[in-house]
Design a protein with these regions (language model features):
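N-terminal Rossmann-fold NAD(P) dinucleotide-binding loop
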Residues: 15
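Phosphate-bearing ligand-interacting subdomains
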Residues: 40-133
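Aromatic pocket-lining residues of Rossmann-like dinucleotide-binding sites
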Residues: 22
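Residue-level detector of conserved catalytic or cofactor/ligand-binding positions
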Residues: 134-142
Length: 142
């Protein structure tokens, strides 16, 4: 099985967790962040790590987007950077863009820009933990 490489933009806790899980499962991952220290620290968990400002369309184009089918935009805390990067990725024609949103409004804007999959990590994790807890409660009660 040949798995297409994935680009992860934003190597904070969410981005590096996602990227390292992908690489440990055999996926080639290009990690991108504007912070050189973060890129340096993340490099061991990635196939390739690059310092670049993804809000700059020219800088993003230099990363070889034509070869990338899947991008995860893991920048959530910086609304402007998230929106600019999402716009650049969509305009570049990336066929599968996932993006992290920190609020319903942020998610709505990302969808309006054309992002294919919007992820709300805290909301989604809260729901998942609630379902796990409910399963345990039902199992342990007579």
């Amino acid at each position: 099985m040949n798995i297409a490489p994935v680009m992860v933009v934003g190597l904070g806790r969410f981005g590096i967790s996602l990227a390292s899980e992908l690489t440990s499962n055999g996926v080639e991952v290009l990690g991108v962040d504007s912070n050189a220290k973060v890129v340096r620290e993340s490099a061991p968990f990635l196939t390739e790590a690059v310092v670049a400002d993804a809000t700059d369309a020219d800088a993003l184009a230099q990363l070889g987007l034509e070869d990338i089918k899947h991008v995860v935009l893991a920048v959530g805390n910086q609304l402007e950077a998230s929106i600019l990067t999402a716009s650049n990725l969509i305009e570049s024609g990336v066929p599968d863009v996932w993006a992290k949103a920190n609020s319903e409004a942020h998610g709505r804007i990302l969808k309006q820009l054309g992002v294919h999959h919007v992820v709300h990590p805290e909301r989604d994790t809260g729901r998942r933990v609630a379902h796990l807890l409910l399963s345990l409660i039902h199992i342990s009660e007579p």
